[in-house]
């Protein structure tokens, strides 16, 4: 934790923020292009919409503070603009129930979709059209290289061999790679989400409440709310008190966005975060590569990361 924390602090300056933001932005734009190409060929149904996004701020200072980053992103073709409270409410009428709002940043090209439904649909395409075999429940305990092959052993004793291995195991990647003398600076930051029926005044545009660090995302006839960031919490089990905190914060932010009395499902996940907040996508040698450390942007960066990871694994870069 201490080593990771010191590395994180070394990035905590304006130069580091700009460098890391642009690195992540480039990957996000690659992901958008890759997703568009995939959906043209395979129209997977996952509540996908180009709904736009509003980053909301409780003070005018916060809104103006985002201006420099907007100008920087504009050079990469990203469409964003500053909006005051009235303009934000005109874009998303559901914000009429947010008296704390001072203004925000509007990104009209932002997309939304259900990652679970997408993953199910993509797996079906891969199996039916490309002959991919999925092996679930293989809890990998160790990874070693012998006789020109990678040997994987599961906790139940099963074994696999492979010529190439791509490690995408989130926070568990560090434990798998450490015996190979490969240290990965990845920290677990636990986040929560819940999904509920739409409320009486649910937003259509995706909403980020920067004051409470919450995200509201409409998925068809449901709405998903995500937030919280519990540093160095390696327990994947949801804690009822923390989930209750998330629900209370969502109520305070947008009280009519969801039917908070009828939560359909809740979830907690361990976000694998690097000190510089962008992922590690690297060829590690001998047919081994890694694709880890996406933090809270795993869904945003997934497609571009996958393309880069395959290139690294096959030695194309």
Predicted regions: what they are:
Residues 2-121:
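Rossmann-like flavin
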Residues 37-48, 128-133, 182, 254-261, ...:
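Surface-exposed helix-capping loop/turn segments at secondary-structure junctions
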Residues 80, 210-211, 251-317:
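C-terminal catalytic lobe of FAD-dependent flavoproteins
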Residues 83-92, 111, 131-150:
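A conserved short coil-to-beta-strand element within the FAD-binding core of flavoproteins
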Residues 102-104, 108-124, 138, 177-180, ...:
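Flavin (primarily FAD) cofactor-binding/catalytic cores of flavoenzymes
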Residues 142-143, 214-217, 281:
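A structural signal for short hydrophobic beta-strand segments in well-ordered beta-sheet cores
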Residues 152-203, 239, 256:
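Central helical "cap/lid" subdomain
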Residues 176-179, 183, 199-202, 220-224, ...:
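Flavin-binding catalytic cores
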